[in-house]
A protein has these predicted regions:
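Positively charged, small/polar-rich N-terminal and surface patches that mediate targeting and assembly
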Residues: 1-115
Length: 115
């Protein structure tokens, strides 16, 4: 896959969901990453939080004695605003409970790993 010149103004999208969220029986974060990869996005990062709470105000933590942790997951994607805008309707279908934010960023270096 070739990448266009990526430096300059881009959009950072953050998708905040729970670890137990699913899409057609698959972990939601995995389904989103697969969708982004198939659509040719330059990359995505999945971050697993050690603790947090969201709209439900239920505090989730990674303490060992908890059986149901449902830790916070944040996906980060940096891409052109146009490409992100095109996938928002699909994300709206997939994300049943969560938060999606967009912000402008300035990419100063993007160097894909050599295979």
């Amino acid at each position: 896959m070739t990448h266009e010149k990526f430096e300059g103004e881009r959009t950072l999208m953050r998708i905040h969901i729970g670890e137990s969220d699913k899409w057609h029986g698959k972990p939601l974060h995995e389904a989103i990453v697969e969708m982004l990869r198939k659509d040719g996005f330059s990359g995505a990062t999945v971050l697993r939080g050690v603790a947090g709470y969201g709209g439900s105000s239920i505090y989730h933590t990674d303490k060992l004695l908890r059986l149901s942790q449902d830790l916070p997951i944040v996906l980060e994607v940096i891409e052109s605003a146009e490409r992100i805008e095109r996938i928002l309707p699909r994300l709206d279908e997939m994300v049943d409970g969560g938060l999606i934010t967009l912000e402008k960023v300035r990419v100063i270096l993007y160097r894909p790993a050599k295979k």
